[in-house]
Amino acid sequence: MAKEKFERTKPHVNVGTIGHVDHGKTTLTAAIATVLSKAFGGEAKAYDQIDAAPEEKARGITINTAHVEYETANRHYAHVDCPGHADYVKNMITGAAQMDGAILVCSAADGPMPQTREHILLARQVGVPYIVVFLNKCDMVDDAELLELVEMEVRELLSKYDFPGDDTPIIQGSAKLALEGDEGPMGKEAIMKLAEALDTYIPTPERAIDGAFLMPVEDVFSISGRGTVVTGRIERGIVKVGEEIEIIGIKPTLKTTCTGVEMFRKLLDQGQAGDNVGILLRGTKREEVERGQVLAKPGSITPHTHFTAEVYILGKDEGGRHTPFFNNYRPQFYFRTTDVTGSIELPKDKEMVMPGDNVTITVKLIAPIAMEEGLRFAIREGGRTVGAGVVAKILA
């Protein structure tokens, strides 16, 4: 099979493997890449290539993740696999690799284990919308009833965390057999079934350009005779000259009109997701807009101060705090382009949070920020990152 160049014609979907240590996540990742590259083209990756995951930084946090790409008949997938449990926690909370769906790997020989549960909970908290299950090591279980039992346990666990356990596709197989070239129902056939489940069960994600217009404010200038220009990178959607937009966050929401879009000193009639632009605002004063606010389509996003979040607190060796923090700890929360002070309320059963922990917290900010569930942020003290988080639920 000749190597084909990367065709952007197929829709692109981001997935990743989650599940307990040693249940076969990396073996499955290698098996999928190997089997699908033979079936649909692309490049196979060996197990040890995936396991030696390079370090990357996301929001000031070092994470090891391996990236693999593969294709099915209908789609192009980017797949992330993490070597260690801590890397999963960090990856999911920082959104370093935002997942449109996850492949939960569970060993049929062991059944659900503590990290199986923890990864499902994390997936729920950070907003991974779909989970497909691969019941691995089925070649080691002779008893069909036992397989059924494990499958039931996994479905119950998914339902417990508000995933549709009864409707979730569960594929039985053996990643090891598939990787070794076994063509049978446990090997290649299981991987092909998994690919089909990914194609049909995980919907094609909305592209950034199709969303409601949103641009975080990075800088504000006053240009004599022209008015106020706000610069930034459009996160999603399209803004057209003449459209009404809202300025949201920090201060009371203001309505204004876009009277011009500028990119590389050229005037455009519209700006779209991914563009670094200057947006000219009619009748808006320079001091009415500041970094940390967003420009957005009216009514599409609202400002909030009170929310729950799933956070990861950096360990001492990662440049984080050296000491635990307690209830009412007041760091800065860095949303998009600015810091806002807020106080942290810990869960009732938690007296303190140690460096290296992940925990669910409740936050009250001193100023409102345009937010929605799934928004990422960094936790900082005097400009250095001490943690990362994601908005789980907006309270007020």
Swiss-Prot record:
GO cellular-component term (any): cytosol
Entries under InterPro entries matching the protein: EF-Tu_GTP-bd (IPR041709), EF-Tu_GTPase (IPR050055), EFTu-like_2 (IPR004161), EFTU_2 (IPR033720), G_TR_CS (IPR031157), P-loop_NTPase (IPR027417), Small_GTP-bd (IPR005225), T_Tr_GTP-bd_dom (IPR000795)
Residues annotated to bind GTP: 19-26, 81-85, 136-139
Sample GO molecular function, one term: GTP binding
Top-level enzyme category: hydrolase
Gene behind this protein: tuf1
Protein name: Elongation factor Tu
CDD domains registered for this protein in UniProt: EF_Tu (cd01884), EFTU_II (cd03697), EFTU_III (cd03707)
